[in-house]
C-alpha cells in the first residue's frame, strides 16, 4: 500500500534550518523529479478511498498542483488552485495564512457558494494554512466534503479535525536528524 510514496519518503534527505528539520521529497518539493508512477499511485489511492462526490478539487500552489491535477484527470472532477498571487478578479477571496515558518496571503478564485469541495494538499505540519483556507471557503458558502493530505507531520491534522472537517492523511511521518521515519500508512501502523 503506497509503496512508491513510502520509499520516496524513506530516502528523503533532511536539512536543518533554524532548529527545524525539513525533508526534501518529490511530492512536497518537486526535488528530485516527480515520477509519474508516484502521482498515479497517490491519485489511485485517493479515488479508491474517498467519496469523490464533489463539485471541485481545491489545492494550494505550489506542490498541491501536481497531486490535484493527477486526481482531477483520474476522477474527472474540475480543479481550482488557490494562488499566492492576487489577480483582482470579481469574487476573489484573500486569505491571510501563517505557518510555523512563514506568513503571507493566498487568493481564492473560481469557487461558488454551494460548491462541494475536496481539498488536497501535499503536506500538513502546523495546519495553519489549511485552517485559514477552510475558514475562507466556508465563509464563501462552500461545503468542505473532505480534506486529504498526502504527508502528515506534526499536530496540524488534529487542529483541522477540531474544525469538524473530515481529514485523511495518506502517510504519517516523523522527521529528525536521522531522517524520515514512517509512523503510519493510511491507518495502518508501521
Swiss-Prot record:
Per the record, the pathway is:
Purine metabolism; IMP biosynthesis via salvage pathway; IMP from hypoxanthine: step 1/1
- Kindly list the GO molecular function terms attached to this UniProt entry: guanine phosphoribosyltransferase activity; hypoxanthine phosphoribosyltransferase activity
Record carries keyword Glycosyltransferase? yes
What CDD domains does the database record attribute to this sequence?
PRTases_typeI
GO terms for biological process, alphabetical: IMP salvage; purine ribonucleoside salvage
Q: What is its EC number?
A: 2.4.2.8
According to UniProt, the reaction catalysed is: IMP + diphosphate = hypoxanthine + 5-phospho-alpha-D-ribose 1-diphosphate; GMP + diphosphate = guanine + 5-phospho-alpha-D-ribose 1-diphosphate
Give the first-level EC class, as a single word.
transferase
**Location(s), subcellular:** Cytoplasm
Its GO CC terms are:
cytoplasm
Entry's Gene3D superfamilies? 3.40.50.2020
Keywords in alphabetical order: Cytoplasm, Glycosyltransferase, Purine salvage, Transferase
Query: At the top level of its lineage, which domain of life is listed?
Result: Archaea
Please describe what this protein does: Catalyzes a salvage reaction resulting in the formation of IMP that is energically less costly than de novo synthesis.
What family does this chain come from, according to its entry?
A: Belongs to the purine/pyrimidine phosphoribosyltransferase family. Archaeal HPRT subfamily.
User: Could you describe the subunit structure of this protein?
Assistant: Homodimer.
> Could you identify this protein by its name?
Hypoxanthine/guanine phosphoribosyltransferase
Amino acid at each position: 500500500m503506497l509503496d512508491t510514496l513510502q520509499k520516496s519518503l524513506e530516502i528523503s534527505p533532511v536539512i536543518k534550518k533554524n532548529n527545524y528539520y525539513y525533508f526534501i521529497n518529490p511530492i512536497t518539493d518537486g526535488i528530485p523529479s516527480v515520477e509519474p508512477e508516484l502521482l498515479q499511485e497517490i491519485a489511485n489511492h485517493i479515488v479508491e478511498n474517498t467519496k469523490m462526490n464533489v463539485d471541485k478539487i481545491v489545492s494550494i500552489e505550489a506542490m498541491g498542483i501536481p497531486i490535484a491535477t493527477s486526481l482531477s484527470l483520474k476522477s474527472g472532477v474540475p480543479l481550482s488552485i488557490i494562488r499566492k498571487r492576487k489577480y483582482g478578479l470579481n469574487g476573489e477571496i484573500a486569505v491571510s495564512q501563517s505557518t510555523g515558518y512563514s506568513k503571507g496571503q493566498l487568493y481564492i478564485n473560481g469557487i461558488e457558494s454551494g460548491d462541494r469541495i475536496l481539498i488536497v494538499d501535499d503536506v500538513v505540519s502546523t495546519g495553519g494554512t489549511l485552517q485559514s483556507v477552510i475558514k475562507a471557503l466556508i465563509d464563501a458558502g462552500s461545503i468542505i466534503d473532505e480534506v486529504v493530505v498526502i504527508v502528515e507531520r506534526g499536530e496540524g491534522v488534529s487542529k483541522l479535525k477540531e474544525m469538524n472537517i473530515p481529514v485523511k492523511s495518506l502517510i504519517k511521518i516523523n522527521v529528525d536528524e536521522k531522517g524520515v521515519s514512517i509512523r503510519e500508512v493510511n491507518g495502518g501502523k508501521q
